[in-house]
Amino acid sequence: RLEQYRIDAEGNAPIFFWQQDGDYLRSHVELSYTIDTRDAQIFPRKGGKFEVLAGYSGLGGDVHTYNFGVNGSYYWNLRGDTIFSINAGAATVDSYGNHDVPIFERLYLGGPYNMRGFRFRDVAPYNPALSGDETMGGRSSFFCQFEYSIPVIEEVRVAVFYDIGFVNGDAFDF
């Protein structure tokens, strides 16, 4: 995959963004393996999905990184069509050579898919001296979600959930 990125820091943008201002060409190749035993892709009631992936950027272009990730989820259909599920994921990204991991390659958590209750991309390291209250992204992340859902009427469910997770600044820092 070949992608073009532009970071255009303006006005009172944190210094961290100014340091990465410019155009980037990213060439990326990724290999993944997935096992999916869920009974449905949308609103599964039983089974699981497990995925491992590895990626490499730097076959030309300006971005020189590699990444690894693992994600898994499992669903149990209990009495009365209630469902208990666990969803978890871990990832890491690092650079090679004399390059840094650009902000668009860094890891973040937050939002409806991994850390509900937090704003999108709000869970990540930040350095007040460099970026004020803006997150700078990290190089290692982990999250785990527990959810129990109860049917209200057909196709409508109410859920109770508990999400945990973290993002660290260093690669392979779990």
Please report, for each region that a protein language model flagged, where it lies by residue.
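C-terminal outer-membrane beta-barrel translocator/porin domains of Gram-negative envelope proteins
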Residues: 3-155, 160-172
